[in-house]
Structures are given as structure tokens and as C-alpha cells.
């Protein structure tokens, strides 16, 4: 359409072109029928084009009609596309509104971390607080700078021993009140003190900003100090975590490897000590429970078994038996002898020394006796031996050629019944007191008296020893009588 109008204007510059512009009479109710209108407009345009081609005389009219039709068709298509765009925008707007309704409202202002402080609290003094003329003030430093309601005072007093604490009150030389201390920072030799002023004291901030460089004082009664050695205990680093805070001990880095190794070792020992203490407490509680549950009864306890050497029935080891075993054997032997009613076979001292401890119930002593030596019974000094019986020779008449304990082998091999049949004992000597040697032994100076013997404990053993002693005396008497007879009658 635009090409036809342009060509016509060039051909006929003086002719006025009547151009019909489309009217904006779009009905909102017919937005969805744009496709149908487009279909109905297409055959109408084709019909007009065919009629325009057939009528050659009315060329201008057909051209203008076709132009108007094409303009109306194009305007109709543009209206349809505009209607579709409006509909799409309406649907998109509804979707955006739904999304806004579903999402939470976005926070207003900057995003804050967990430990971040939004606004610093400003300490304020009471309104009626005044510094009188009698109040003592002490110079502390000079006004260094002022910015954003903050007054910085550079201290001229060293803080190596102590520094001011938060809450101390500052003033000027003319006792003009500045405010309360908010923060201490900088080196200890000359620390910096920061004072935060509230927004309501804007005039005071402007006045102090003009008086920078003047001396600053502290109100001595309201000054609070903290010792520096307490601050040195807290170990700090230049690093910071995600919250711009000091790192904990387990996250700190060391410039010295030895210090780092020592720190890790200390931490490991602390963990091990803690685990050991917990385990000990758990074991103690378990042991208490087990002891209470497993306490045995008195009846269920096992019987104690004596050692092998202490039992009477146990064989002797290395020739030793305990005292209890020896006493039990003595009791058993005495009970057996009392039941049988017979005395043991007489045994001479020579043969007693040959017996081993395993064959005799009593342990062998150094003197060869079957029982331990005891102190003899006390003998009276005026004791007199009874006279020998009639017909019996005195021991002085005998020749002590044969020592005691060394009898002839033939005689030693003879049993007591044979001796009694060979020489019936018609004369008997009364038994001497226990521990008194025979007559011949008392009169023989060459005889070495054996150590006195004491009866062992127990009535049965004492009786056996007495019987054995009597038998030995009888054998010795028979021997002397036999020798005396052979000397008097050599023919026999």
C-alpha cells in the first residue's frame, strides 16, 4: 500500500490523495474471534482483487478500493496480534501475582549474619549528671578525631599496667562533659579510647569537633580500670571467622611448628584423660552392680584343701612333714598300739640311727632320737638308788668291755622271744626313773652320757617309750649276766 501511494504521489504531485486511516474500534469481547475474522477477510480481499483486475476503466477507484481493503485487512491482522499480546500479558501478570503471593516477603535492609549487630547501643548518662568544681579530674590524653558521632581520644598515659574499662566518663579541662567510654583499641603503650555520642547530642558533637587537639580528662571517682595481665591471658589472633570474630582454639593457626605440636599434644591428652575418666566411672558402676548380684552364699563356698605337706596321708617330700601331720601320726600310732595291746619291737640306738625318716613316724633329730629333745625332769639332789635285788650282781662287778649299743651281731639278730627262752629272766630290776642312766653307765667314767630325753607329748607315746626303755635295760642286764657266767665257767 505504501508503494502505490508513493508512486501516485510522484506521478501526480498536485493531486490530493484521500487516505482512509483505520479506526481504533476494537471490541474487547471479540478478542478470541480474531482467527475467524481473518478467514472471512481473506476471500473478500481476493474477490476485490479479481474485480479490480477486470475493470480497467475505473483503475483509480479500484486501486483506492483495494488499498482501503488491504489497509483494513492489515489493520485487522494488527488488531488481532495486539489482542493476543494483551491477552498474553494479562495471563503473565496473573502468574507473577500468584508467585508473589506464594513467596515470603523479602526482608528490607541489609542481610545480617547470625552474630552481626545491627546497631550499636549507645550508653547515655543521666540528664542531671554534672561535674562539680570539687570533683577530681585526671588528664588522660587529647582529642584526636571526630566522625559519625564518635570521639577518639589518644591516651598519653601508658596502658601496660592498666587501662580504662567501658563505662568511664570523660570531660574537657573546663569540665565540659564528653560522654562514656565505649571501646578501647590500639597498642598498650598509647591506647585509643572511643566515645559514642547519641543522635540527640548533635550540637555537642559539632562543638567537640571544633575543639580537636585539646586535653581530655577522666572523672576520677567514676573511672574503672582493668589490669593488663588479665587481658594478656586471653590469646587472640589476627584471623577471624565467618562472623568476623576471634577464632576458637581448635581453629587457630600457629607460626611456630613446635607450639602447634605442643598444643595438639595437650589437646590429645585432655581428650584421652576425659575418655579414661568416663570409662573408669562406667567400670566402677558396672563392678558395683556385679558385686551386688554375684555375692556367693556361705554354704556354696568351696572347702579349703590343706597343702600336700600338711596332710597326714600325703607322702613326705624331702623328709619334712608339718607339725599337724606329725601329731596326727602320733595319735594314730598310739591308738593302734592300745588296740593291739602289744609293745613295739625293741630297737637299739645303733639301729635307730640307721632308720630313715620315711620309715619311722617321728622325724629324725641330730642326736638320732625318734623324737625332739626336751629338757630332763628336775632330779632331787638327795636321790638314792634302791639296792639291787637278792642274787643279782652289782654293775661294778661287770667288766664293761662291750660298749653300749655295740652288741654282737648274733645277739642283735636274736629276737626277744628267743632271748627269753635261752635265758629266762628270773631276776628283774625295778625300773629306774625316766631320764636316769643305768648303774653301769653311772660308774663307768668312759661312758659318755647321751643328752637327757623327755617324753613326747601324749600319754600313748610316753607309755611306749617307757616300755622300750625297760626292754633295753633288760637286754643289757642279760648280756652282762651271760658274760659273767662265761667268765666263771669257761668250760661251758
UniProtKB/Swiss-Prot annotation:
Belongs to the NAF1 family. Residues 1-117, 237-351, 472-492 are annotated as: Disordered. The lineage of its organism: Eukaryota, Fungi, Dikarya, Ascomycota, Saccharomycotina. Residues 264-278 have a biased composition (Basic residues). RNA-binding protein required for the maturation of box H/ACA snoRNPs complex and ribosome biogenesis. During assembly of the H/ACA snoRNPs complex, it associates with the complex and disappears during maturation of the complex and is replaced by GAR1 to yield mature H/ACA snoRNPs complex. Acts as a competitive binder for CBF5 probably required to prevent non-cognate RNAs from being loaded during transport of the particle by inducing a non-productive conformation of CBF5. It comes from the Eukaryota. It comes from Saccharomyces cerevisiae (strain ATCC 204508 / S288c). InterPro entries: Gar1/Naf1_Cbf5-bd_sf, H/ACA_rnp_Gar1/Naf1, Naf1, Transl_B-barrel_sf. Residues 334-351 have a biased composition (Polar residues). This is H/ACA ribonucleoprotein complex non-core subunit NAF1. Residues 172-230 are annotated as: RNA-binding. GO terms for biological process: box H/ACA snoRNP assembly; pseudouridine synthesis; ribosome biogenesis; rRNA processing. The modification Phosphoserine is found at residue 255. It is found in: Nucleus. Residues 472-485 have a biased composition (Low complexity). Residues 35-49, 279-289, 324-333 have a biased composition (Basic and acidic residues).
